[in-house]
Structure formats: structure tokens, C-alpha cells
Curated annotation (Swiss-Prot):
Coiled coil: none annotated. This is DNA-binding protein HU. Keywords: DNA condensation, DNA-binding, Phosphoprotein. It comes from the Bacteria. Belongs to the bacterial histone-like protein family. It comes from Geobacillus stearothermophilus (Bacillus stearothermophilus). Histone-like DNA-binding protein which is capable of wrapping DNA to stabilize it, and thus to prevent its denaturation under extreme environmental conditions. Homodimer. The modification Phosphothreonine is found at residue 4.
Length: 90
């Protein structure tokens, strides 16, 4: 399912117009993104948790030259599914 299909599903199940469903979906994504940018954790009970995880610096290789290089530490978004979502998928 892509974003357009998600918007269509939200519009159909909620009775919203596609324009309003688009605004709602975008607002949810923007809210989650902003919370993660601030370093907050987003907990949606039953669905799952969005959080920012730290990746440690590590050694890697340039695939073109084979030269060893240092990959700097970074932050990455992560999602951990909740119990209800896990059970629904089984």
C-alpha cells in the first residue's frame, strides 16, 4: 500500500473527502516526524512505537576502491510493532 492508497482507504472508511483524508494523513505523518525530530518517542498503544535510535560509529569499506573508512555515528528512525499489530499479522 502506498500513500495514495492509504489516503483512499482513510477517505472510504471515515467518510471524509479525499482532500480532507489527505490533510489528515499528512498531519499524522508531520506530527510523528516533528516528535522524532525533537527526540520524543511516539507511542500508539496496540499499534507500535516510533523512536530515534543511535547508530554507533563503525568501520566500513568503500565498495569502489576497497579502502577502509570510518562511518560516523548517526541517528535513525525506528518502529517497533505493538502486540495488537503483531497478533493481527499472524
Amino acid at each position: 500500500m502506498n500513500k495514495t492508497e492509504l489516503i483512499n482507504a482513510v477517505a472510504e472508511t471515515s467518510g471524509l473527502s479525499k482532500k480532507d483524508a489527505t490533510k489528515a494523513v499528512d498531519a499524522v505523518f508531520d506530527s510523528i516526524t516533528e516528535a522524532l525530530r525533537k527526540g520524543d518517542k511516539v507511542q500508539l498503544i496496540g499499534f507500535g512505537n516510533f523512536e530515534v535510535r543511535e547508530r554507533a560509529a563503525r568501520k566500513g569499506r568503500n565498495p569502489q576502491t576497497g579502502e577502509e573508512m570510518e562511518i560516523p555515528a548517526s541517528k535513525v528512525p525506528a518502529f517497533k510493532p505493538g502486540k495488537a499489530l503483531k497478533d493481527a499479522v499472524k
